[in-house]
């Protein structure tokens, strides 16, 4: 986004004698619920913190300093790449570092690696963390097959596992999932499309629904959300669903798919795009065809610079903002409890997510996303410092920024 959690699919691999569980091709929809999960602390009274405690100043993390002093072992963080989203190095790494340090961990107590898009590199990084005495691994896997293999090897060594940002289908028993409510992300995209069609006065909407990569569990949840919101409009004939081709997180592939669909169905006049990068690729195609602003809705997520600028330009209806500082703190807090041998409280682990491959309900820390338009851009992403005004408000967008009260 993503994605807000969006990446190129890599093949499943084996880790030692562990056979990777290729859960990527499951066609069963995955549902997220708000059922309370988690449990009471262990024999030592643990500090209590909730999924709604976190703020942009990271002050809540100081409540967990006792956990940092009680805990043992390394917390290893495995990030996926730098190509599918700028978020991992620009936001996840510094925010996770800040969260760990605010809770009292030293530089030798945690380690953050990026696999640069290579499943074999992530495997090597995981093995190194385990060898160095990791007690907890945060896994933001490139794909479910390789992620499941890493998690199986980790749990075999007694290492606790957290699925960070994306659920690993077929992952380890006993893990915790930390992410935004990804069905809600999809619902925001779907409602944003509806609102945009109305405000831009799109006549007889013929919508192309474009998904993320089907092997990414988040993409499944996003689609569950926006298709659920749009289905009544399709069912009553208000909108026409032109098609829903195979999904991708590769923008160039998304552009090609859109152009092929538009050639075959020139009546398409709106697109559901699941993230900002794919939307940007589609918008580039629209601009080549000289389609004017505020006539052809697209959607997105991740609140990327290009996405926000496309919203200001009137080519994108909005973008889902997932404040990564919330997700980083949720993951760091969960890791601190596990490292200290404590069960994270139910106020933190506030939901469950169904892993249909493992046929398991995974305790989850679910954080709340925000739909960003020109109406609230100043009070959300700009206020939080997620984007610099100097980067956002280039000369061509001076008037749009002024109208949006961004300064």
Name what the model sees in each region.
Residues 14-18:
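Hydrophobic helical h-region of N-terminal Sec-dependent signal peptides
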Residues 2-6, 12, 24-407:
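A residue-level marker of the well-folded mature domains of exported/periplasmic proteins
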Residues 19-23:
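C-terminal motif of bacterial Sec signal peptides marking the signal peptidase cleavage site
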